[in-house]
Amino acid sequence: MRRTLYRLMIELTNGRFTSYILRKFAQSRLSSIIIPSYVKVFQINQDEMEKGLKEYGTLHDLFTRRLKEGKRSIDTDASSIVSPVDGVFADQGPIEDTKTFDIKGKRYSIVDMLGNEERAKRYAGGTYMVIYLSPSHYHRIHSPLSGSVTERFVLGRKSYPVNAAGMEYGKEPLSKNYRSVTEVNSDGEHMALVKVGAMFINSIELLHERSTVQKGEEMAYFTFGSTVVLLFEKDMIKAVQELTSGQELRLGEKIATRVSHK
């Protein structure tokens, strides 16, 4: 019953018009009135922000803020995979040979997430990682490794919540929501960075258009909190043992080690 009611309420409120109004408000000067309250409620660290609070003219400007130089360091070990975002570590584990994995009692299909069988098959037997970004986090997304960009594509139209309630009661939001995917070939092994849109402010802006990317390089930004999913080929990485669900991660922090190079 809870799941049914939850989905009904989301469908009633999650329309294009609502998203349009919220997006326009966030981009308007009027939204600057609530910036101080937003910063206080979500406990945003002002010392890390590139600019002073009064220099952000809209909520959108605040959502997409950059950090001061030197506030994040990228792990320099050649074999390391780093967190592409500031966020909360949600889960990690094996991708089954059936190209599926389970989170919070839900089975997710890599075929659905990536749009077709051809893309998905290279990740069978591999590893997934999920990191959640709340409204308080820095919203820019960076590359977790260096390599050549092999494909960029967008899937889905609508987005549903990716918070705890959304993950429990929603319809596989990680593979159904609007999402932007970047695939990277690193020394012959592939990784997919899946940027999952959030409900209402359903926008992911790509900033990187070159054919190569360096570890820690800025790639995109969310205009509100959301989620990233990392997919790795079989036997490509070993996750850091200390990672636990609910753990805060910072951009550039080591989350895994490369275990083989083809």
Swiss-Prot record:
What membrane topology is annotated for this entry? Peripheral membrane protein
State the Gene Ontology terms under molecular function: phosphatidylserine decarboxylase activity
This protein's UniProt keywords: Cell membrane, Decarboxylase, Lipid biosynthesis, Lipid metabolism, Lyase, Membrane, Phospholipid biosynthesis, Phospholipid metabolism, Pyruvate, Zymogen
What does the record give as EC number? 4.1.1.65
PTM (free text): Is synthesized initially as an inactive proenzyme. Formation of the active enzyme involves a self-maturation process in which the active site pyruvoyl group is generated from an internal serine residue via an autocatalytic post-translational modification. Two non-identical subunits are generated from the proenzyme in this reaction, and the pyruvate is formed at the N-terminus of the alpha chain, which is derived from the carboxyl end of the proenzyme.
| Keyword flag Hydrolase | no
- Predominant localisation class: membrane
Per its record, the protein catalyses: a 1,2-diacyl-sn-glycero-3-phospho-L-serine + H(+) = a 1,2-diacyl-sn-glycero-3-phosphoethanolamine + CO2
Task: State the free-text cofactor note.
Answer: Binds 1 pyruvoyl group covalently per subunit.
Database matches in NCBIfam families: PRK03140.1, PS_decarb
| Assembly and binders | Heterodimer of a large membrane-associated beta subunit and a small pyruvoyl-containing alpha subunit.
Record's family?
Belongs to the phosphatidylserine decarboxylase family. PSD-B subfamily. Prokaryotic type I sub-subfamily.
Protein name per UniProt? Phosphatidylserine decarboxylase proenzyme
Q: Which source organism?
A: Bacillus mycoides (strain KBAB4) (Bacillus weihenstephanensis)
Gene it is expressed from: psd
